[in-house]
Structure formats: C-alpha cells, structure tokens
Amino acid sequence: MSPVSVISLPSDLCLPTSFIDRSGRELIPLHITIPNVAMRRQGKLMTRASMSMNLRTAVSDDAVIRRRGDFHSNLWDDDFIQSLSAPYGEPSYRERAERLIGEVKNSFNSMSNEDSESITPLDDLIQRLWMVDSVERLGIDRHFKKEIKSALDHVYSYWSEKGIGCGRESVVTDLNSTALGLRTLRLHGYDVSAEVLNHFKNQSGQFACTLKQTEDQIRTVLNLYRASLIAFPGEKVMDEAETFSAKYLKDALQKVPVSSLSREIGDVLEYGWHTYLPRLEARNYIDVFGQDTGNSQSYMKTEKLLELAKLEFNIFHALQKRELEYLVRWWKGSGSPQMTFCRHRHVEYYTLASCIAFEPQHSGFRLGFAKACHIITVLDDMYDTFGTLDELELFTSAIKRWDPSATECLPEYMKGVYMIVYNTVNEMSQEADKAQGRDTLNYCRQAWEEYIDAYMQEAKWIASGEVPTFEEYYENGKVSSGHRVSALQPILTTDIPFPEHVLKEVDIPSKLNDLASAILRLRGDTRCYQADRARGEEASCISCYMKDNPGTTEEDALNHINAMISDVIKGLNWELLKPNSSVPISAKKHAFDISRAFHYGYKYRDGYSVASIETKSLVKRTVIDPVTL
C-alpha cells in the first residue's frame, strides 16, 4: 500500500493520426502538434482552458491511500525500438519473393498434371495435403488461396464416410491421409465428420499401432493428434484420439533421437492448436522444415518453400519495425508514460496482433489491437487497484457523456486516462468508418460503455469484499474480460466488409463473441486469482465456484474451470468452422484468433503482468529477431 502520486499531464501533447497504406508498402504516421491541446471532440479541438478543473466537484487526491499492483516496468524503451535494424525492407527481397511465389504456384499446378501411371491416387492426395499443410504452417498461405482451394476441392472429391483410401472405390483407408485430410478440410470449412476415425480402431474399440515406432508411423499419429485438436462439441472420438495420440507421442519422444521430428512433436504437444499462434508456428516450423528430409516430396521444390518462408518472415519484420516506431510515438504522445500506476505492455500486445495477422495490409488491425489493449490495461489497473470507488463512479459517468468537459469532475490522473480513451476510440472509429463506409462511433462507444459498467461492478465487489455467485460473476466477467472491445474496432479497420448481419455473427449477440470472452475470463482467472486475492480482490471464478459449492477445494474449482475451458474451445472451433455458414471463415477469423492470442498470454502464467519470461521470448522470436537466410 503506497500513497497516491499526483500525475500532471504535459501541456503539449503530440496527437498521432495514422494513415495506413493498404498496399502494405508504406506506413506513414502523421503527428499533429497542437499547443495546449490534449483532446478532440468529434472533430472539434478542445483546449485545456475549455475544460479547466472545477475544484469544488473534483475528488481530492490529498491523503488518499491507494492499492497498487506489483508490476514491472516497460521492457522495450524507445531507444531499443529505434536501434532495431530492418535490412529486408529493400525491394530486391520483395522481388525475389515474388519470383518464388510464382514457382511455388507452378508446383501446386503441376500436381494436376502428374502422369497418372507414375503416382498412385493415395500418394497424389497426400502430396496435395502436404503442400497445403506446409504453406500454412510456414506462414505463406496467403499467396496461394486459389491453389489451396483447388487442391482441397480435389481431395474432398475423394472423401468418404471412411476417410481417404487408395481411390474413390477403395475399401482400404489410410490413417495418415485421413487424419491430415480431416484437419485440413475442416479448417477450410468443408463438411467432414470425425466419425471417420472410428474406422481406425481395433476390435476392442481402441486406437492401436504396431509396437515398432517407425518414423512414418510416428508422423501418422502426429497428424492424428493435430486433427483431434480441431474438435467440435460432442465428438467423443476426437477426445479418444487426442488421449491416445498424446500418450503415444510423449512415449515416442523418450525413444526417438533428437531431430527435427522430435522438435516438431515437442512443439505440437507444447502449444496444441489454440495457443499455437500462426507466426510463432511459422518461426518454429521454418527451423524444423529446414532440417526435415524424411517428410519431403520428391517432385516438390521444398527448398523454394523454405526460402520463400524465410523471405516473407523477414520482409514482414521490416514492416513490424516501422509499425513499432509509430506505436511508441503514439504511446508517448498520448501521455501514457506519465501513468505510473499501470502496466505498459503496448509492445507485447502489438506482438500478439502480429502473430495472428501478418498480412501487410492489416497494419490498422495490428496497431488498433495494440492501442485498444493498452487502454484496457490502463482501465483494468485503475478500476481494480488505483482508483477509489467515488472516483470510479465519476469516471464511469464521464465516459457515458463522451465529452471532454466531463473531465472537470475528475481527479488529475483520471483526466489523462479519460482523454486517451476518448481520443483513441474516436481515431479508431475514423479508420473503421473509412474501411466500412459507414459511421461506427456510436456502436463502438456502446461497447466501451458496457465494458466500463462491468468494471464498475467489479470495483463495487472489491470495495465491499463481496463474493457474488458464480453465474453473476461469470456473466459480468465475460464483459469485463475486454475481448469485445479489443476486437471490435480493430476488425472493422480491415479490408473485410462487415455489414450488420455479418457483424452480429462476430460481435454481440453472437456465440463466437460470448465464447471468446468466456475463455479469456476463465483462463485469466486461473492464472491471476492468487495475485488478485493478495491485493484484496476476492471475487474470481475460483472463489465464486467454491462459495456456490461448499466443501469444494481450490483444486476442485480449478478442475471444473479447466473442463469448462475445454468445452469452450470446442464451441469456438464450431462457431468458426461450422459448414455451410452464411458468414465466411475469413470474417470470423480475426476475432477467433484474438481469443487464441489472449489464451497464449495466459498459457503459463499471467503473461501481461509478468511479461519478462515467455511473453518476452515471444516478442524476441517473432518481432525483434529475423531468421537467418
């Protein structure tokens, strides 16, 4: 417990306005310096003189004792970001990548022209699946959308209720191609049933393999495990496949020598699918793919795939540097460094965004996500620890007025918080308006107001020491998790159209939004409840469950929450991938992947409060360090 520090905002703030070149070739940050101005009001500049503080209505900071979180400081200062080199932004690298893209497209097309006498139908299907799987895991699939669809349409034409066999009329099926086909086809929205896996059980109803663990057999079980992770609700056979294959692979790791295969197995077991962020997977798979001779296809130019993957990784690295430089200027210009009561994780949030969306044209999404999450973190620390209940009630009312003059009743430190919320939400709405061709501000404001209301409810519980029922806490906690406000404006800045009927399937009242919010609340609480309780925050999913179920232990509660998380993940999979949906996967993918990004942040611990271990490693591996060509 430490006394409050009164924080004064600088009189001159540099307000960033971004112009994102959707071609991806340029990112031009524009800074407008406005003397004695710290705010905008729907296009009107608001001077500090026009919002002078009314001392009679302000909450006094004198002698207020405040709680503070024990958080480490920002790990990535401006000097470090500026010192990063980005040699792969030169045009010659882009030109080389474009040539390789053409050659890889030729490799895809050549699969349709193979001599039918020189390759069996099964080998042909495996090669097509391998090619699609490889470009996706290497992070270069965005260049081959047409070729991927053609390959998968061909594979799907051979799909039967027993999976994939040696031909359309064959009664002999193959587990490797069936498992890889089930996973890949399902991820692209094809209607494929997991029941095909029942045909690979023995008479006892168990999955079985020979005792001798050959490399081919290990790879088959690895593909079975990867397929089992794309499970939908109620698919018992997928649970059985996951249990069997996970045990088999863990046993194999103890026996096979250290190799690209053992590393691949280790990575898949470590991250699964829901926390294996695409750019992290690409970074890891580049290393594995470069050493992997046993999984190469004779007629495919695997070295070209690898070279292209490395070039694309590093070319994006150059764009990341420019975006980071802009983000740091925004962070400094917003007055954030003076907010010493909260965590500063803008670089970490940008990293998560760039791990799930590394298309060059989606700069607005990446930067918008980082900004929104920074605001969420500031508000989280203010409502949970630093602010008094009276101050928070005033702030909540001020947000609903959406007018800088509302800050007259706020203490000085809250003025800065209010204005970063106000300015940033308005600026992101302007970007969304341009992308969507309609006004989005009022809709997005409503989302932020509901989010603030949920925080206010939690602040009241903290102040009173009340532990609500699990249902009451859980429903409020899904809103206060921040998933909706972290996703809404960033996805609206993309080049994907979101008419009202599509937005309803991604935002409220969609099941996708509800489940994504649920996993953030549930997983976050399992990682944070002990630290929160030490700071006086009694209510959590764990404590509320124990209150509702007298006699249960923390272990019982955690087991229950973890089972809920498993079910939520399956529900999320279904909402994203359900066949014949009126909303394309592409419209839902960013919101879905945001849930994966947050889930990764809580995989080992609260990676947002303690960002100096796994989260720091993620930043270095996917943003700071290029790969060696």
UniProtKB/Swiss-Prot annotation:
Mg(2+) 2 binds at residues 380, 384. It catalyses: (2E)-geranyl diphosphate = (1S,5S)-alpha-pinene + diphosphate; (2E)-geranyl diphosphate = (1S,5S)-beta-pinene + diphosphate. CDD domains: Terpene_cyclase_plant_C1. The keyword Magnesium applies. Its main location: plastid. One of its GO terms (biological process) is green leaf volatile biosynthetic process. Coiled coil: none annotated. GO terms for cellular component: chloroplast. It is an enzyme of class 4 (lyase). It is found in: Plastid, Chloroplast. InterPro entries: Isoprenoid_synthase_dom_sf, Terpene_cyclase-like_1_C, Terpene_cyclase_plant_C1, Terpene_synth_N, Terpene_synth_N_sf, Terpene_synthase-like, Terpene_synthase_metal-bd, Terpenoid_cyclase/PrenylTrfase. Its cofactor is Mg(2+); Mn(2+). The keyword Transmembrane does not apply. Mg(2+) 3 binds at residue 532. Pathway: Terpene metabolism; oleoresin biosynthesis; Secondary metabolite biosynthesis; terpenoid biosynthesis. Residues 1-48 form a transit peptide. It holds the Pfam family Terpene_synth_C. Belongs to the terpene synthase family. Tpsd subfamily. This is (-)-alpha pinene synthase 1, chloroplastic.
